[in-house]
Amino acid sequence: MTVHRKRESMRENVVKNLQNNLALDNCVLHWDGKIMPDNEEPGNVDRLAIVITASGQETFLEAPKISSGTGENQASVIVSKMRDWSVTDKVKALCFDTTATNTGVHNGSCVLIEQALKRELIYLPCRHHILELVLRSVFESYWPTSSGPNVPIFTRFKDKWSEIDQQKYVAGISDQGVFGVIGDTKEQILILLTNYSQISQPRGDYRELLELAFIFLGAIPPNGVMFKRPGAVHHARWMAKAIYNLKIFLFRNQFKLTNSEMKGVRQVCVFIIKFYVKIWFSATSAITAPNNDLKLMQELLSYNKINPLVSKNASEKMAKHLWYLSEELAALSLFDMNVSLEIKKNSYSSKIE
């Protein structure tokens, strides 16, 4: 037996053991399509990552190839894999990106999965996807989509990086315009950052965002001050753009910016520190989502007194994605420790009347 075939045999045995030993009562099904290099032929291929979560545990099922990312193709593959893993009766909810491919009322993946299972499921839209749309609306307040996915300022900064003295960064909070907006809440934000930094993050860019937020506020991250070389800026990764904005502002004394660019970078950074970090790192909790989304909407509307443009664009975008304030999902707040008992009682009473 060749090494390749032996590896394949071992992988098949591992999968079978996982399938046989998977002990779940109720779970949430997650999926996300990705374009990846094909490991068999030259070029790229569409793959659909399928995961189930239950009781704080995550199980990766498979990432099969799909011919195209249509709702019908996705649903067909997902249902097939659910049956392979014997979890069709255990899946109670779906977590997905809020694209038409998934949410379409006739041919969306969600409704087609329900039809295949012959029962309704709870919809738990991916809040990270929703929040990236909100960040995009803020970013495009200063850099319209006509600038393209690779905004010239990021390309310039990336090319300039080798000339920048990383020891001579300037904290964002030292800027008068920044301090005037977030100076009063600096300590509260740092407490949140400290709490989030103690939690294992699934991606390197999540950790980098946390570290840059510490530095922006004039503090030292738990692992010290370090800066990573600016990477690729893909139009679909708004996290990368957030990281670029923070770095540019930290090195604003070494990187030449026009007045318009300085204003845009400053305002995007303020939004990231004041709003985005908190909502991003709490996004995975469905129980706290209703209360968090309600507070976010209230804060975005109140922000009109400080920045009417950002307030308008961000609140309008968020208003289109208030899934967790629906009657069905708002009930999750009954389990939220941050919601007062009085509010829970009133909410419960209104539902049974």
PLM region descriptions:
Residues M1-E353:
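Alpha-helical structural modules in large enzymes and assemblies
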